[in-house]
């Protein structure tokens, strides 16, 4: 049984309704609206007793087709419904199918920078699954062309050329921009700070100017918990002092301040998410960095026979087992937060994390459990600047955005990462 809620009745067709001349199609608890095959809906309801919700407003699709009597419009509408049904079937068979999704929207045009990277690629996939149109803008300096969902439009960018990004934004005509593109290696930022201020701040400013010029309504920014620096208390709330201790965190904080001014002076509504440790994967997209600094993919290199051992940096921290504690958030949960942030009226700064911390040793032990293999670890000295414990309070996002992580357990996060890495042991081909 994939779900946890029991159902006493079959409700295949009650989700479909005519709203303002269009159709709202609802996939509810495995059932499909009456535009889809009722037998298939019955099959889903019987086989997958789960709480699975996704709402789609197709009125704009129908209008683009030319109205009720337009034959081409009707074909487009029927194809759209068939696509929704196929997506429902795919999710039911997916190991991620226990996620309860509630996405209600008019479809939007979304411009995603850094959509060839780890977080951007998964967010692009989730946006497309939810019915949005996506343009991905990426210079591929860190990302991978094959990590871009084939359903998205791809623009090879040169963010340092103001005219390029302005033209791309004008052509896409987005209602929302999701800005993931950035340099994000703390250590590198300490040796090459100019690279970080140039890309994360100056190129970000170019994007902001393009957004204002194109009259974009919403800007969602990928910030970081590194803007806080060493926290005064844990769990960390959004009102903590921001005292970054490296150019990476400083560059993100500078852009946060720019967003506040652009909202005040230009009316650009924004949400900035301060991520903790993104991890996990979907069936199609996972984590592949050319320089891998993240713990979970590095640990998984051992059972993949790509390394003999993993490393533990510091075993004398004031934590129960002496190793650093971090907060891990599943990449799908992170993507869902971004879609919630796109709603009108949502704005401000939000932490994104599970609210539970796991030590380095606990992560290694969990990877051993999931892979069924022993993972040797070499103990090394602390790395400069590593705080003992970083754990988020995401209560503000829960209260104000209606967000709630669906993968709070480390085992589930590691399991999805392991499945992806087994299928893609060398990552993306490009």
Regions found by a protein language model. Give the residues of each.
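N-terminal helix-forming leader/targeting segments
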Residues: 1-57
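Short, charge-rich patches within N-terminal targeting peptides
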Residues: 63-73
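Short-chain dehydrogenase/reductase
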Residues: 197, 245-253, 289-297, 327-328
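N-terminal Rossmann-like NAD(P)+-binding domain of SDR-like oxidoreductases, especially those catalyzing
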Residues: 103-278
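Short, positively charged and aromatic/hydrophobic N-terminal segments
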Residues: 77, 89, 93, 97-104
């Amino acid at each position: 049984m994939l779900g946890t809620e029991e159902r006493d009745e079959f409700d295949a067709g009650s989700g479909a309704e005519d709203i303002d001349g269009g159709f709202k199609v609802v996939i509810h608890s495995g059932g499909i609206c009456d535009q889809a095959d009722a037998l298939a809906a019955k099959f889903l309801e019987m086989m997958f007793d789960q709480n699975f919700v996704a709402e789609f407003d197709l009125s704009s699709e129908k209008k683009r087709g030319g109205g009720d009597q337009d034959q081409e419009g009707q074909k487009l509408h029927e194809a759209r419904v068939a696509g929704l049904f196929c997506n429902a079937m795919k999710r039911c068979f997916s190991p991620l199918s226990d996620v309860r999704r509630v996405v209600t929207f008019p479809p939007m045009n979304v411009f995603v920078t850094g959509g060839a990277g780890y977080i951007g690629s998964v967010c692009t996939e989730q946006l497309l699954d939810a019915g949005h149109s996506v343009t991905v803008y990426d210079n591929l300096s860190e990302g991978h062309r094959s990590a871009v969902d084939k359903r998205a439009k791809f623009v090879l960018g040169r963010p340092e050329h103001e005219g390029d990004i302005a033209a791309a934004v004008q052509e896409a005509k987005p209602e929302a921009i999701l800005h993931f593109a950035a340099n994000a290696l703390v250590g590198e930022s300490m040796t090459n700070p100019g690279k970080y201020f140039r890309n994360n701040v100056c190129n970000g400013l170019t994007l902001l100017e393009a957004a204002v010029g194109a009259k974009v309504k919403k800007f969602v920014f990928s910030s970081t918990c590194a803007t806080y620096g060493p926290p005064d208390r844990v769990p960390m709330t959004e009102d903590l002092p921001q005292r970054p201790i490296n150019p990476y965190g400083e560059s993100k904080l500078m852009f946060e301040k720019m967003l506040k001014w652009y909202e005040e002076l230009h009316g650009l509504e924004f949400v900035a998410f301060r991520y903790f440790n993104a991890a996990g994967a979907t069936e199609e997209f996972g984590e592949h960095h050319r320089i891998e600094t993240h713990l979970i993919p590095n640990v998984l290199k051992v059972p993949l026979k790509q390394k003999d051992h993993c490393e533990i940096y510091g075993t004398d921290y004031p934590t129960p087992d002496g190793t650093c504690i971090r907060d891990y958030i599943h990449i799908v949960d992170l993507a869902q937060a971004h879609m919630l942030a796109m709603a009108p009226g949502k704005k401000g700064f939000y932490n994104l994390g599970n609210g539970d911390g796991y030590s380095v040793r606990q992560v290694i032990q969990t990877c051993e459990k999931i892979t069924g293999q022993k993972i040797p670890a070499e103990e090394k000295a602390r790395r400069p600047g590593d705080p003992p414990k970083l754990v988020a309070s995401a209560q503000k996002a829960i209260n104000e955005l209606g967000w709630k992580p669906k993968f709070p357990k480390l085992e589930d996060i590691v399991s999805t990462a392991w499945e992806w890495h087994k299928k893609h042991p060398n990552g993306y081909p490009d």
